[in-house]
Amino acid sequence: MIQLSAELLGRGYAPKINDFRTAAIPDLTEVIIERRWLQNHFLNTIFISFETSSYDPIRARFVICAFRAQAALVAYDRAKASCEAFFDTFIDGNPVVDLYFDAVAQWEGVVLHLHHVVDIFKRANGNDYSKSNVEKRLGDVANRIKHVAEYIPTSAHQGLTIPMWLAHDGVETSKATVTFTEIADLLVALAKHLDKWQDPIALLKAEWP
């Protein structure tokens, strides 16, 4: 079996692909269960009387955030499973590329869905999330993914094959890193808030911590 150098694999496939052999990815099994945030919120609004027009923007924020949170949790579960499959089949100098890129795609989904949620509530509350280190870095990673077409022909891309890659402690770009633990913590916090926010009265007072 041919074994390729880490440098060649990194240049041809993805940075650090041959170094990605283990990862500390928190288990969110207890969080990744069937959630009924959307259904519960819908039913709760039926029995509460308030000015519909003034609640419409709040409702929109909740629906978008709830479905993206659900999507992020599903993607997180799949990303963790893909990483574990990649590690189980790992061969130094000859990694299973398809499994690696499946994991990358799932982690990109987690980042993008989670960033949408953070951005919506920060803007709604008029908060400056640039002052929050984790959320700022999450935004930097998300923007690299979304705007990769703009970076490819520029020096900012630095000859990279993909905008985001995987390291043993988290996801990385040329600009920022967010650890798997930080991502898990944000998802856990979001799930707890949505558990409360499915009640419209609580949602009216909602603020991102």
PLM feature spans:
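Amphipathic alpha-helical interface segments
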Residues: M1-R137, M164-P209
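Interfacial non-cytosolic loop connecting adjacent transmembrane helices
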Residues: T154-L166
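Histidine-centered, metal-coordinating catalytic motifs and their short helical/loop contexts
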Residues: S132-H157
